[in-house]
Amino acid sequence: HRVDRRQRQMCIRDRYNHMYIPRDFGDPQQNFWNLVNAATLSDVAVERQVEITGPDAATFVQMLTPRNLSTCAVGQCKYVLITNAEGGVLNDPILLRLAENHFWLSLADSDILLWAQGLAFNSGLDVQICEPDVSPLQLQGPRSGEIMQSVFGDKINELRYYWFAEFELDGIPLIISRTGWSSELGYELYLRDGSRGDESVSYTHLTLPTIYSV
């Protein structure tokens, strides 16, 4: 259903991380100028999360990356490299610390879930590793701040770069972070209720473009 609807919106799809991704809507050059001058909204549900919980979660997450995470606070994001035993880079996710022993790795294209589960098996650490039902959107561009304020109110302006907070949109639980793939102002919106995710996508695709020419 979701792919068909995006096809009707002139979407070009591709495969990424074992999933279909709506890669492009219309003219690529116009999409670029929308990003630079206004804002672009991207369905990046292909960026899956690896959830790590348990009494030893913080210790285990530090095992995955050479970056020192000792100063990573609850509510903070970190850009990290996941490396193998030889120091080769397996992935470069955004790490979100949701609680003292509750982490997400927001991934690019690789099977880090399987890598982390394999590493945990003989680690001797008490951790649980799974893929939560979480699908992100990215809103990027210089007008993304005013768009987010119009939807979520002034609280969104309190978000610092590489920090996140919990929000709701029509009863749909979200985590919103001040992060993103572009060099412009931007946000990532993590939908935490897969059964209602299409409602939120419909809202942002149909309402925000009318107001802001997204």
Model-derived features: where do they sit?
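Single conserved hydrophobic/aromatic residue that forms the stacking wall/gate
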Residues: H1-R8, I12, H205-V214
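Short secondary-structure junction motifs
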Residues: C77, L90, G124-D126
